[in-house]
Amino acid sequence: YLASFNANQRRNIRRERKAVQQAGLQVSAIAAEAITPELLARMHGFYEDHCRRWGMWGSKYLTEEFFSLAQPLRQHLVLFSAHRQGEDPHQPIAMSLCVREGDHLWGRYWGSTVEIDNLHFEVCYYAPIEWAIAQGIRHYDPGAGGSHKRRRGFVARPHASLHRWYEPQFAGLIKRWLPLANAQQLEEVEAVNAELPFSGRQIPLAPEQGKIEG
């Protein structure tokens, strides 16, 4: 993973990871049968608090019921617990939730009770990447958005979404606007990927604009 970056970004990543260690923290992966209902309840608490901090932009999609229903599916779940060094991983101060299927790992949601520099990067990116490599997982998707992701080696890719408007006049306006919006998004993907801090690596850029329908 580190070898794919230029020298400057390798130093940055090592520095960010070291900062978390110097804060007296370590991150442990808790997967499958080791995940208890209590841990899922804690994860919900972290998630809810994180969404609350962002107010109207919090995008709170998941409910408490979702986390309680996730218990039977825990063979597909991985929790990354940030805790004090030498202490119980089941007593976290921050957590992230990932989903695993085959050789794919998906991450998106996290939360923390403390503000520590680079903790988000460690819990959401570096620790899951390290765990995925050890498990032979080939693909890790950290979720949508976030310009900071490119500094951690994540290639921007376009994703399709489906929307429906029930007001015909408004739907017509949106439909006419979509081709331009999609073209602009693809240009942004190209621009983001052109700035990836890789060293001599071929970067798969966005597909031709015709690949996404308006």
Could you tell me what each predicted segment is?
Residues 1-118, 163-164, 196-214:
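A conserved beta-strand-loop-helix scaffold within acyl/acetyltransferase catalytic domains
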Residues 3-5, 40-43, 108-111, 120-122, ...:
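Surface-exposed beta-strand edges and their flanking turn/coil or helix-capping segments
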Residues 11-17, 50, 66, 128-131, ...:
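Short, surface-exposed linear patches
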Residues 102-168:
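Acyl-donor binding region in acyl/amide transferases
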